[in-house]
Amino acid sequence: MSTGRHLPGGARLSSFRELYGRTPACTARAPGRVNLIGEHTDYNGGFVLPTVIPQVTTVELAQRGDRIVRVCSAEVGDDRPAEYELGREARRHAWVDYVQGITWVLAQAGHTLRGADIRIESSVPLGSGLSSSAALEIALLRAWRDACRLDIADVPLALLGQRAENDFVGAPVGVMDQMACSLAEDRVALFLDTRTLEFARIPLPPGIDLVVVNSGLSHRHAGGDYMTRRRECEEAARLLDVPQLRDLPLPRLERTIGGLPETLQRRVRHVVTENQRVLDAIAAMRAGDVALLGRLFYASHASMRHDYQVSIPEIDLLVDLARQDPRVHGARLTGGGFGGSIVALVQEGAGCDVAHRVVREYDAHSGQKATVLVPPP
């Protein structure tokens, strides 16, 4: 998720030794994630179904003898480190806020840190709806955990990452991204109940290729439309006198929401039906029913487009181009929306061909430059 601040990723960065004159004491990694289905449900206490992608964020760290943190990232474009002092973290509205947020939240949780030299490199594309910020947070937390021998299990680690992004960076994200980056596995979906944090690992059905295409249009989570959607959901829950929209039953939904303003009706309808689609998707995966899973993808996209209103014409174009190919079972916007990426279920062996055909036609029709992220080059 992008918040309008630059996150590490992309450019060539000098080695740790070239930057700091020594070798790192530890190296930690965390993957990006793609959400298969269950969009904008996490901050409503609902269900999500993400899996990891091949792109990762890598953090190298060596502790210092003082309380200074120096950090270099590939995104900055030079080797001059950002610098701050532990205990004096202050929001700068820059990429280093994610690093500061992690040391701040660790201190808030009672952990003792020393200063450190840090190098960050990432192949998770920014603003693509694939959790570049969560991958960074989890990689940083893992590095600090290893370096300082902190006793933090993977679920509490994810919660610390979410708290850093919520309370320090200022992005009102749910917990899905950090949980996925901390717990998910390749070709295994993580079914997560975001209220209870209970989870189960669901293998992807055989016979499919997963395709992820980045539209080339980034999104933002620390303000604007994303924050508006969250506030609309909170207001709808208040008016309906439920703790969260997750608590509304699907039967008689239209009668339940009939007294709300039309905009809030749309938001509630998406969240409640999307929660059911997650449960239906799990049943389809366990049954190996790829056709049903694909139909759920298309239904999810239609709901995000018409009821939650987070899609944009370029994303709709990508989904429509994918739908035209008989080898595609389903496709949808993935991530927070307002740009980002689509995820598609494709007949096994056809993923690369389908992805590159969609990109060529998209580039020709939109004037934008899309990128195939999965399958990786």
Predicted segments, located by residue:
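C-terminal nucleotide
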Residues: 2-33, 37, 58, 62-92, ...
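FabD-like malonyl-/acyl-CoA
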Residues: 134-135, 341-345
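Gly/Ser-rich oxyanion-binding loop with an adjacent helix/lid
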Residues: 2-28, 33, 38, 46-47, ...
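Structural signature of FAD isoalloxazine-binding scaffolds in flavoprotein oxidoreductases
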Residues: 46-65, 184
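Short pre-catalytic strand/loop immediately N-terminal to key active-site residues, enriched for Gly-Thr
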Residues: 126-127, 329-331
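A short catalytic or substrate-binding loop motif that flags glycine-/basic-rich loops and adjacent residues
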Residues: 40-43, 51-53, 275
